[in-house]
Amino acid sequence: MATPIRIKRSAVPGKKPQVTDLQVGELALNTYDAELVTLRDNVLYVTGDGDDNNTGKKLGDAKASIAGAVAISTTGDVIRVSAGTYTENNPIALPKQVSIVGDSLREVTVVPQNAGSDLFYVAPGNYLSEMSFTGTMTAGSAICAFNPNKIYYSTQSPYVSNCTNFVTNSIGLKIDGSKSI
């Protein structure tokens, strides 16, 4: 017979376990708020009031930029971007299998700082979702492009879902470094 699952519980309104109270994958339940909490070790946070010197591992210790979170990300990480406008030093080269997920399409705006460069260099298995892109780029620059300095033999495409591109002169997605869609 399988071992029963044990869940830490609290009936105190608003009480959540501290990071030190849970192990990775362990669950806690606040029965008053009907909120289930788990600790994941593969999530990085970005907020408008964050600091790129922070760890990014907790919402209260978030990075200030998407590029700051990407710089410490590894395969399988999810970067959660809180509502706000983020001017990013591009291009930002994403490691394989890294996801960037905004709070909401209408609340997360990303502005490329370097008009002559692509915004994101995507890799196999990347996932971009719930962001809007604004600003101006040089004609031929893209929001998403494969890194022209790397060769990918991909069995897994990058995915872009529920994003809006309002960047003047830009291309949404560049394939093989030069072809656009």
Spans of model-derived segments:
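Extracellular/surface-exposed low-complexity repeats and stalk/linker segments enriched in Gly/Pro
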Residues: 1-27
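Short, surface-exposed terminal/edge motifs of secreted or surface/virion proteins that either
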Residues: 27-42
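Right-handed parallel beta-helix/beta-spiral solenoid domain characteristic of secreted/periplasmic
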Residues: 89, 98-142
